[in-house]
Amino acid sequence: MPNMSPTKVPMPQQDPNVRNKNFEEVATGYTAEMAMEEATRCINCKNRPCMTGCPVNVPIPGFIEQVAAGNFEKAYEIITSENALPAICGRVCPQENQCEGKCIRGIKGESVSIGRLERFVADYHMAHGAKAELNIEKNGKRVAVVGSGPAGITCAGELAKKGYDVTIFEALHKAGGVLSYGIPEFRLPKSLAAKELELSLIHI
């Protein structure tokens, strides 16, 4: 039975007296128990308006259902079928205007915390999951992508799924574009962005 609480499970954060002395991430993320509790707030509605608000068409009800059941690796598999950067998107996408902005639960309360759940799943995979083994038949063609910002990485990932051997060329010292150079550490840790780029299995 869905959890009909009108409010989201609160996001744990650093104490203000601690975070005013460092540049570490302010929001510390859900525990497994918190994520499962929040996931039960999804009523798996028939029309799935949350998906119409997602620019990359992540199967949101499907991955949330797996989180509620404690199947975190299956949830990761579902998310990454459409989105190669869930840890990053779970932190910096404007969910309040996209998926969460369309959530039915938001009509009489707070929407399901889709972004926080996506972040939890990605962080869980980074901590516990095995490195992905892609069984994709190569088509023998090579593609170069210029620029390793979010658009370049996404393009490369989609091409790789279709069997292309993709190499990204980047002029700067670090890959990621705005992910590495434009977002402050307390919002998106540089080490996390680098780790997610590594998991994307794209040559840069």
Regions found by a protein language model. Name each.
Residues V143-D165:
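N-terminal Rossmann-like FAD-binding beta1-loop-alpha1 element of flavoenzymes
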Residues M1-R142:
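Ferredoxin-type iron-sulfur electron-transfer modules and their immediate structural context
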Residues I202-I204:
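Conserved small/polar residues in nucleotide/adenosyl-binding loops
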Residues Y164-A175:
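Glycine-rich FAD pyrophosphate-binding loop
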Residues A84, G149-A151, K174:
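Residue-level detector of alpha-helix initiation sites
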Residues E77, A194-E198:
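Solvent-exposed alpha-helical segments within well-ordered globular domains of core cellular machineries
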Residues K174-L192:
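Conserved N-terminal glycine-rich FAD pyrophosphate-binding loop of Rossmann-like flavoproteins
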